[in-house]
Amino acid sequence: MKKILIATKNQDKITEILDLLSDINMKLISFQDIDFNENIEETGRSFQENAVIKALTAGRKTKITTLAEDSGLEIDALGGRPGIYSARYKDGSDMDRCMKILCEMKNISKEKRTARFITIVAIYEPLTEKVVTFEGMSEGYITDKPLGKNGFGYDSIFYNFALKKTNGQAKLAEKNKVSHRSEAILKAKQFLIGL
């Protein structure tokens, strides 16, 4: 059975990806399964560059077909911040980062709070040395307070237009029907099936 390495140490992302790929006829493994402890530096200037860096680095070292992704939140009123720095926007917890965003946006009206989550999935195939990428996007806006306890990252402050509630108020199955990550992963899934 073909192996696919999911190149992330973020357990929440692994959970979402495993759920989305649960019916694929391949063995999905993570860094923990192969004792991969290297820290991959995200030195790219875009989600695509970072996803490709992660896929190439992990795939070349392990010689396993590798799926990596980079995601982030872009807020129009903040000039696209936090963007590629979403996970590193502020030291501390996910809630600390949410509160920083809410503080920065406290005087911004609802109609100017538009935002989107973007995911780029990169798949590296060691036999061909090629990388292919897939994009997913969710449109919405930033709420004025956290709503919901599900998900991770900025989910509690991102009102998802497709869900008609925050990602934090949605169950994983609901979120995985319309999220930026699910859109990109489902495109990648079709590619993987063809390998």
Enumerate the language-model features and the residues they cover:
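Anionic-ligand binding patches
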Residues: 2-5, 11-195
